[in-house]
């Protein structure tokens, strides 16, 4: 469950414990420290966090997070999930074996 949602210029700032995701500034904070993510990493994290508990396939995440002209494959989603976990040191993104990923508190 989202602990706090603030509407700023129409986009929700999400807060889950020590993790805050601000789509307006395109920033992620962990323990109030800025986490550096690429655009695609941010898009994946925000989309998953916006729908906690929902499970998405790699294809669904790819279509949401990747620009239309990005010619990478679905494996790029797996790679970016790994990088998000490593950069932010969070366990909120769960792997659903044989299907995809979901965000859990």
Predicted regions and their residues:
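Basic, amphipathic DNA-recognition helix from helix-turn-helix-like DNA-binding domains
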Residues: 1-16
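DNA-binding patch around the recognition helix
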Residues: 10-13, 36, 79-81, 85-105
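A structural signal for short hydrophobic beta-strand segments in well-ordered beta-sheet cores
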Residues: 19-21, 93
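Conserved hydrophobic "DFG−1" position in protein kinase catalytic cores
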Residues: 21-23, 30, 103-105
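A cytosolic small-molecule/anion-sensing beta-strand core signal
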Residues: 23-24, 97
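Positively charged, aromatic-enriched patches within helix-turn-helix-type DNA-binding elements
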Residues: 27-39, 43-80, 86, 91
């Amino acid at each position: 469950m989202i602990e706090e949602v603030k509407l700023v210029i129409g986009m929700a700032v999400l807060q889950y414990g020590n993790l805050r995701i601000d789509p307006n500034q395109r920033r992620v904070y962990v323990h109030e420290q800025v986490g550096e993510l690429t655009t695609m990493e941010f898009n994946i994290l925000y989309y998953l966090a916006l729908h906690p508990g929902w499970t998405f396939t790699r294809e669904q995440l790819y279509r949401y997070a990747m620009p239309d002209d990005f010619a990478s494959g679905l494996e790029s989603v797996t790679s970016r999930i790994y990088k998000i976990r490593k950069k932010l040191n969070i366990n909120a993104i769960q792997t659903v074996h044989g299907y995809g990923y979901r965000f859990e508190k």
